[in-house]
Amino acid sequence: MYAVIKTGGKQYRVEEGDVVRIEKIEVATGESVDFDQVLLVANGDDVKVGQPMLDGAKVTAEVLEQGRHKKIKIVKFRRRKHSRKQQGHRQWYTAVKITGIQG
């Protein structure tokens, strides 16, 4: 059984037991969180697709950690002008473990 959820402006395909890094949400480590924006639920050949969301479906997860991704470098370079700009960015994430899918 798997589901497609929407959180943080992105969509994730999740199964029970998966550990997923999503955009940061303000929930303490060890607490449970419910995702009610479920786009699709599939159980074998039984597939339910929402338009755009499924009513009554939800995915529950446990927060494992809050952290930051690896640093990415942003470089702006102007040729022949002896000008360049370099910047780094580390995006915050929340790691969650999917504990249940209902729907």
Swiss-Prot record:
One of its GO terms (molecular function) is structural constituent of ribosome. The keyword 4Fe-4S does not apply. GO terms for biological process: translation. It comes from the Bacteria. GO terms for cellular component: cytoplasm; ribonucleoprotein complex; ribosome. Keywords: Ribonucleoprotein, Ribosomal protein, RNA-binding, rRNA-binding. It holds the Pfam family Ribosomal_L21p. Part of the 50S ribosomal subunit. Contacts protein L20. This protein binds to 23S rRNA in the presence of protein L20. Belongs to the bacterial ribosomal protein bL21 family. This is Large ribosomal subunit protein bL21.
